[in-house]
Design a protein with these regions (language model features):
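Short alpha-helical patches at protein termini and domain edges
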Residues: 1-284
Length: 284
């Protein structure tokens, strides 16, 4: 059972889960991810970056000539595209803007634009200055890389194409590792971002069911190069078995060992070769 993250829903979900042992409650992952993106957008340097990006976007879409010139480019995609949430839309625009960096630079330095009336007013000059500012694009690149795994996870949990429970833990784990790697494990640089993820994850989203679903997802379990072996993962699985199982817990534990070690039917070539291309519920 998944509910909104409001305190009344949280209380109701816990009561139902405690009363009916076979029902597991979890807060809405999409809502939590939206709050994470919102927290990141409130960081001072990110807010300044978004403000500059918004100035470019508004200028482009408020001038038909400028927009028409850009749309002539090969493989053009709109800068403004709807996202699953308000904050997602902001970062999608930032990503799209970064994708069109060369198009924008080429436009504002072209003779046609420089000689046109669209380049003469104060706002146009401010926009051109931002577009030609290398630091702006460097900052864009960093933020886009930070939020990319979060945006990917948001699309999974907010969509209806596949059950998402088995991907939440891995998505959050990958996001934290990616941020640390990008900043070359320099704590002073990555901490503002990982702190946001940790606080939201610990306070709102962390549930044993996420760890259990991650452990039972063959796409991750059978990828030993990236599989997370933190004690909390196994602890989550054991807690779910202990609190929710209605059959023999000993048999369940025995089967988890067969699954982990790829024994019996779990070791068949068909099972192994399809573990990443087949949804966990279908694979099982």
């Amino acid at each position: 059972m998944v509910t909104d993250n409001g305190s009344n829903y949280v209380a109701a979900g816990r009561i139902v889960s405690e009363t009916y042992k076979t029902i597991n409650w979890s807060p809405c992952a999409a809502h939590c991810l939206n709050l994470i993106l919102g927290d990141i957008s409130k960081l001072e340097h990110v807010a300044k970056l978004a403000k500059k990006a918004s100035k470019i976007t508004k200028y482009v879409y408020n001038h038909v000539y400028v927009l028409a010139c850009l749309r002539k480019g090969k493989d053009w995609t709109e800068i403004i595209r709807p996202g699953a949430t308000r904050f997602a839309t902001t970062f999608i625009a930032l990503h799209s803007l970064y994708h069109h960096m060369h198009d924008l630079k080429a436009l504002v330095t072209s003779k046609d634009f420089v000689d046109s009336r669209y380049a003469k007013d104060r706002i146009a000059k401010e926009v051109v200055a931002i577009i030609l500012e290398n630091q702006f694009w460097n900052d864009c690149s960093i933020i886009v890389k930070i939020v990319e795994p979060l945006m990917r996870l948001l699309r999974i949990v907010d969509g209806d194409l596949k059950p998402s429970m088995g991907y939440v833990y891995e998505g959050m784990h990958r996001a934290r590792l990616g941020i640390k790697k990008m900043f070359k494990n320099k704590r002073i640089l990555y901490k503002p971002y990982t702190k946001i993820l940790k606080e939201r994850w610990d306070r709102q989203l962390r549930q044993h069911i996420h760890s259990a679903a991650y452990w039972l997802n063959p796409a991750f379990q059978y990828d030993q190069a990236t599989f997370c072996n933190k004690p909390e993962v196994m602890a989550g699985l054991l807690d779910v078995i202990d609190s929710k199982a209605t059959c023999s817990k000993s048999k369940l534990l025995a089967e988890t060992r067969l699954f982990r070690d790829r024994l019996e039917s779990f070791g068949l070539d068909l099972a192994i070769s399809n573990c990443k291309s087949t949804q966990p519920d279908e694979w099982w």
